[in-house]
Every structure is written in structure tokens, then in C-alpha cells.
């Protein structure tokens, strides 16, 4: 597939997602990094987003809860180029009923080449990166070319 460039803006659109057993870990991470996160636009799946809003007072665009379609909503936003970073603390030790949605979300984040953190260490690396508040070019699939080829 041909690639093109997309610029992640200085004010990032960040999706925050956490499975039930990981919600407190994400809450602690968000509270620790609140001064940095407040400069960006936040999205989250339903329960996680409401917990973050309640604990921090930050504005969060809350989707549906993950099992009710929230993971798919976040994935759609990634596909549309509306999410720049995904922080997704998932539980590798417990299966969830919406495991296919989880896999699809991670697949879309990989396809569209956005930074993804699935644990605290990686999330810290991303948010502490000297490029976190910079505009950054990333390579993404050139969908226009892809579609043109398919329609020949």
C-alpha cells in the first residue's frame, strides 16, 4: 500500500481506554499527568471517560462503554484521522466479551500508525517525549490511492 503523510497537531486528540481491572491504573496515570493532558483534547470510552471527568474535572468526550460499542467508536475516529494518540490499558489476564472489538481497535491504531500505549511505562514514554507537544508527521495509508486502485 502506498503511504502519505499526516501531521499530528501540537494539540493532540488523545483516546483513553481501560478495561475494568485497569481503570484505577489509568486514573492514577491521568491524575499524575493532568497538567499535560489538560492542554489536549480527550476522548474515552463511556465508563472510563465519566470516571476521569468526575475525578479531574477535565473535559472528556465520552463514547459508549467499550462492551456497548465504545471501542468501535474510538476505532472509527482513528480511521477518520480524528485520534492522534491511543492510551489503552487492557487486561491481558482476563478475557472480555468484546475481545474482537479490542483486537479491531488495536489493529486500526496500527494501520493508521498512531502512537499507542498499552501500559504505564509506554504511556509515560509517550507523554514525556520531547515531541509530545510538537506537530509531528506520521506515515499513514494513502486511502485515496488505495480506493482508486480498487476501482480500476
From Swiss-Prot:
Residues 6-152 form the MGS-like domain. The active site is at residue 71. Keywords: Lyase. SMART domains: MGS. It catalyses: dihydroxyacetone phosphate = methylglyoxal + phosphate. GO terms for biological process: methylglyoxal biosynthetic process. Its EC number is 4.2.3.3. GO terms for molecular function: methylglyoxal synthase activity. Substrate binds at residues 19, 23, 45-48, 65-66, 98. Transmembrane segments: none annotated. Pfam families: MGS. The keyword Lyase applies. The keyword Lyase applies. One of its GO terms (cellular component) is cytosol. Belongs to the methylglyoxal synthase family. Catalyzes the formation of methylglyoxal from dihydroxyacetone phosphate. This is Methylglyoxal synthase. It comes from Salmonella arizonae (strain ATCC BAA-731 / CDC346-86 / RSK2980). The lineage of its organism: Bacteria, Pseudomonadati, Pseudomonadota, Gammaproteobacteria, Enterobacterales.
